[in-house]
Amino acid sequence: MQPRTPLVLCVLLSQVLLLTSAEDLDCTPGFQQKVFHINQPAEFIEDQSILNLTFSDCKGNDKLRYEVSSPYFKVNSDGGLVALRNITAVGKTLFVHARTPHAEDMAELVIVGGKDIQGSLQDIFKFARTSPVPRQKRSIVVSPILIPENQRQPFPRDVGKVVDSDRPERSKFRLTGKGVDQEPKGIFRINENTGSVSVTRTLDREVIAVYQLFVETTDVNGKTLEGPVPLEVIVIDQNDNRPIFREGPYIGHVMEGSPTGTTVMRMTAFDADDPATDNALLRYNIRQQTPDKPSPNMFYIDPEKGDIVTVVSPALLDRETLENPKYELIIEAQDMAGLDVGLTGTATATIMIDDKNDHSPKFTKKEFQATVEEGAVGVIVNLTVEDKDDPTTGAWRAAYTIINGNPGQSFEIHTNPQTNEGMLSVVKPLDYEISAFHTLLIKVENEDPLVPDVSYGPSSTATVHITVLDVNEGPVFYPDPMMVTRQEDLSVGSVLLTVNATDPDSLQHQTIRYSVYKDPAGWLNINPINGTVDTTAVLDRESPFVDNSVYTALFLAIDSGNPPATGTGTLLITLEDVNDNAPFIYPTVAEVCDDAKNLSVVILGASDKDLHPNTDPFKFEIHKQAVPDKVWKISKINNTHALVSLLQNLNKANYNLPIMVTDSGKPPMTNITDLRVQVCSCRNSKVDCNAAGALRFSLPSVLLLSLFSLACL
């Protein structure tokens, strides 16, 4: 820009302002122009005049003071805006606040465009009134009111004025809207006679940035004459909020050996101030790095984006050589584009140097020794390894494999998750007499694959020598269990079998003795020398100690070792049934009426403890020697039931009827049981057995009980 250009601009600006103010003959307090659009130059030069502002309080501007929202500009007493230092960027908006004892107002300067200024002077300074545009045909004239936040006492203070050139006499101004008669109430008020608008308290832009009010004129009775007309109150931002990091904790990870410039994480802060101003324009930097080894500048943060990247060579990002793989960075965010006057906020970024599998595990020695008693199982030795990688990752965790010497799968190896040791275990008992020594070859690897330039070497295998110790093993019965089948009526003293137990310790030449361990019914005896088992009582298949025709007994074989060892053998005796149990009938009591038309007395059932064919079909008979043939009758229903009936009615009394039942065994077995029949008086649906000394059961009840018994078989 030429040196004479500011002067020409100021003259042009003054002429335009004069033309603008000439639209109204009455003086309106405040800036004659509320909004300016200024093209951004390549650089604002110190003490360079940028533009002239025209402010009037209509009373001579006594004690006029200006305040600028940016600390890098000021307004001289003549209204000239100048830069206090050379500066290339100031943000998007500046605000100028003018105040006298009689009036105050705010002007907005919008910075637009690029660095090169082209076009006419009118293109450089574009004047615009924010309201009203275009000018409306109405008598109420309002302009937006700009009020800085955080103003101090005294209150109330005038912040603007409403003009109505055609207002009738005795009419009044009325102000409504949020902040007046709506919550938050009472912030603004208007002088009903003069139209002066005042604020009653300190404003906070971060609570409400714009108040939308309405102005109208009313008569003395409150009736609206004109309006409502919108009145916008804009709260001008002050830099009163520090940047805040709201998304913590901030934890980033970077793989060891990563190339320079690797992005680790992004940290951004929030500033509650106006994002259109430098008050919320943030810049980031690293204030502190802990630890500061091997370089105090391991990381860099993009001042505008907040991206944290590595700035050291991959060799310095070696997790195994670092004193601590965790770095803590104090990140600072500063508003005002990072200028010294800006407010700051800090947060901690924790960066972990993650491990990769660049070290293979190595056994601490080439050979390990172990001893184990024959017959024992469990862990016999722990194999130790070393690995420089991170103990919390699969790059450190070991996986062991038996690659030779385990054809019978008698051994297994697992990793101890706490120590990373290989726990070698015996899972199938070893036999000293078969093999007293075993040699295993063990391989160790990591859970994660190694990086391409690292491989497993000879130190990743080890040999384990295992010595099996001889112990006195108990004798072993063969077969086990031992099974025999005998009839249940086997005579006492009969030999069932001869048991056989052998001593696994064949080299010790020990003797074996036998004894009974469990014989629930007390039926058996065993010869302690030769193991012959015979009976000491009659075997009974129906005994409660027999389960499903099988009797179980246990025997001991004891060797002559010191101390002696014991083996246990099981004998299962299957008992064959013989016809040694007579059948029995049920029920044994019945009732019948003395005048019954149905002469059926009871349905009898029979049961037998023996097994088929020594049970049904049963034969039912009335013992004829004790009962007259012409009174009672028994008829077969099926193989297990028969019907007892009368051939004629009997007087009330108790009768004992001998019933003879015979099973189908060879030879058959017979049982005679008395059936007690009570003949009762049955009158008017009442059964009376008192005269007969009988129980109170009716014939239908007896028949029903008999049928139920039949159904249960």
Curated annotation (Swiss-Prot):
- The record places propeptide residues at 23-138, 694-713
Question: Where does the record place the GPI-anchor amidated glycine lipid attachment?
Answer: G693
Which UniProt keywords are listed?
Calcium, Cell adhesion, Cell membrane, Cleavage on pair of basic residues, Cytoplasm, Glycoprotein, GPI-anchor, Lipoprotein, Membrane, Metal-binding, Repeat, Signal
Task: Write down the membrane topology.
Answer: Lipid-anchor; GPI-anchor
Q: Where is the Cadherin domain?
A: 139-245, 246-363, 364-477, 478-585, 584-694
Question: Where is this chain glycosylated?
Answer: N52, N86, N382, N500, N530, N598, N638, N671
Known CDD domains for this protein?
Answer: Cadherin_repeat
What tissues contain this protein? Highly expressed in heart. In the CNS, expressed in cerebral cortex, medulla, hippocampus, amygdala, thalamus and substantia nigra. No expression detected in cerebellum or spinal cord.
Q: Does the keyword Cytoplasm apply?
A: yes
Question: Tell me, which GO biological process terms does this entry list?
Answer: adherens junction organization; calcium-dependent cell-cell adhesion via plasma membrane cell adhesion molecules; cell migration; cell morphogenesis; cell-cell adhesion mediated by cadherin; cell-cell junction assembly; cellular response to toxic substance; cellular response to xenobiotic stimulus
GO terms for cellular component:
adherens junction; catenin complex; caveola; collagen-containing extracellular matrix; cytoplasm; external side of plasma membrane; extracellular exosome; extracellular region
GO MF annotation terms:
adiponectin binding; beta-catenin binding; cadherin binding; calcium ion binding; identical protein binding; lipoprotein particle binding; low-density lipoprotein particle binding
Keyword Transport included in the entry's annotation? no
* Signal peptide segment: 1-22
Q: What is its main location?
A: membrane
Q: What Pfam families does the database record attribute to this sequence?
A: Cadherin (PF00028), Cadherin_pro (PF08758)
User: Which InterPro entries does this UniProt record tie to the protein?
Assistant: Cadherin (IPR039808), Cadherin-like_dom (IPR002126), Cadherin-like_sf (IPR015919), Cadherin_CS (IPR020894), Cadherin_pro_dom (IPR014868)
Disulphide-bridged cysteine pairs:
none
- State its location(s): Cell membrane; Cytoplasm
Outline the subunit composition.
Answer: By contrast to classical cadherins, homodimerization in trans is not mediated by cadherin EC1 domain strand-swapping, but instead through a homophilic adhesive interface which joins two elongated EC1-EC2 domains through a region near their Ca2+-binding sites to form a tetrahedral, X-like shape.
Function, as annotated: Cadherins are calcium-dependent cell adhesion proteins. They preferentially interact with themselves in a homophilic manner in connecting cells; cadherins may thus contribute to the sorting of heterogeneous cell types. May act as a negative regulator of neural cell growth.
Q: Which PANTHER family match?
A: CADHERIN-13, CADHERIN-23
Q: What is known of its domains?
A: Three calcium ions are usually bound at the interface of each cadherin domain and rigidify the connections, imparting a strong curvature to the full-length ectodomain.
Q: What is the protein name given in its UniProt record?
A: Cadherin-13
> In which organism is this protein found?
Homo sapiens
